Amino acid sequence: KTISSWGSGGAILTDNKRIADKAKKLRLHGKQTNNESAIHPGLNSMMSSFECACVLVGLEHSDEWQKRRHKIASYLKEKSPYACATSNLKMHTHSKLVFQSAKRSEIQEQLKQNGISSTVHYNLMINDEPLYRGGKTLPISKRLKEISFTVPNQHTLTDAEVEHIGKHLK
């Protein structure tokens, strides 16, 4: 996920409501809408020709963008007292810069007050989705879900923006 793409494409033509409803769910990870839980397995593999062309352009810049994300990640890891989920990896794409703290909510509020976005990914673990309930419990994954958050790490960030994030990621 280090090269962005936009939009989606493809079409299914049918006058059968049941088929149309199922096709809509299959194209969105088995969900009716993005805010709902999966009710059966599905995919998200939609890509138009235009998206493909944009990705090809992105490939020309991917090494440069990767170096910039690595530089930003190194700086923010150095400035932050919080554990970084990627701190022990020699090579990482840094498509997401994940920090961990039991004080996640407080940290996110502080970042928000200073105009810095932070995100919690994977609020609902796959084994908690209605479709997969009743299987294994994953206590380590659950704990990581509760303490992990990401901060901006796009290659487009200016040095001043990176310093601003580093100043408030404390």
Q: Across the structure, where does each feature detected by a protein language model lie?
A:
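Glycine-rich phosphate-binding loop of ATP-grasp-fold ATP-dependent ligases
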Residues: 2, 6-12
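PLP-dependent aminotransferase class I/II
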Residues: 15-170
